[in-house]
């Protein structure tokens, strides 16, 4: 049987992401883009080969608190300044927006 399934949580946490802030004030997280691009490419291949996957969810769209390391690692497509609560789209957020808009790479 080809059981329907979905990926409920996929993502990566990075410590010290503020070191990747560029002169325009947003985080250039190419490592996260590469991570998601690779995972989505393999998922696409699996679907083409008959996998019955009907959904894919990233871990979180916004930097969040983790039971394991609080706010030490950052996970989202949107950065959160913990002092001001200002939210800033990361490079990966701009990338995933385009992937979603175009329904693929």
Cite the ranges covered by each PLM segment.
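Non-catalytic scaffold segments within catalytic domains of secreted glycoside hydrolases
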Residues: 1-105
